[in-house]
Amino acid sequence: MASLSPHRTALIVVDVQKAFDEWEAAGKRRNNPDAVKRIVQLLADFRAKRAPVIHVRHASRDPASHFWPDQFGFAVKDEVREQPGEPVIVKHVNSSFIGTDLEVRLRQMGIDKVVIVGATTNHCVETTTRMAGNLGFKVKLVRDATWTFDREGVDGELYTADQIHAMTLANLREEFAEIVAADDVMRRLGTT
């Protein structure tokens, strides 16, 4: 992976919200248990190098959802809370770009590369990654700073979070994003 200029690369933190803790407490199994720790490391690195950080939160339009703004689950996880000056984008669909000013903000900042982390790999992270690629951004999707949950298939078969995560990364690889590890990003951010 080539170097990443801190002036042209933004970290996009997608939906790292407490609702996912509620899912785990209800017995849903996830992969990448250290993903949030990796996100915290990336946040520290981007902030230290004064590279832009943008936070995205999902606000459901369904009052019964864990992501409803008045629910506990809407809140961001404490360890990834935004710092002063870091924008927070609130979205209502899977894409961080639809119905938001994310693209405009990135273009106004002169950003041409985005590093995407968060949850879940096969929903909002995947949709945001595809759209960022389609909009012409060079996307780095951080495989160890994203996660998903087990899912039941249409015929009742179980797909593990690891299987879903791996297939999603395979689908996005090359056409929409470069799949990278957090350590790779931290090693390349700001190097010449």
Task: Specify the residue positions occupied by each region the protein language model found.
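N-terminal nucleotide-binding beta1-loop-alpha1 segment
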Residues: 10-16
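Short acidic/His/Gly/Ser-rich catalytic and metal-binding motifs that mark active-site loops
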Residues: 19-22, 149-151
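Active-site-adjacent betaalpha module
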Residues: 1-10, 37-44, 48-49, 61, ...
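Generic enzyme active-site microenvironment
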Residues: 13, 55-56, 142
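Short beta-to-alpha linker loops that shape the active-site pocket of alpha/beta-hydrolase fold enzymes
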Residues: 17, 59
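Acidic/histidine-rich helix-loop elements
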Residues: 21-33, 156-158
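Charged, well-structured alpha/beta interaction segments
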Residues: 28, 36-39, 52-54
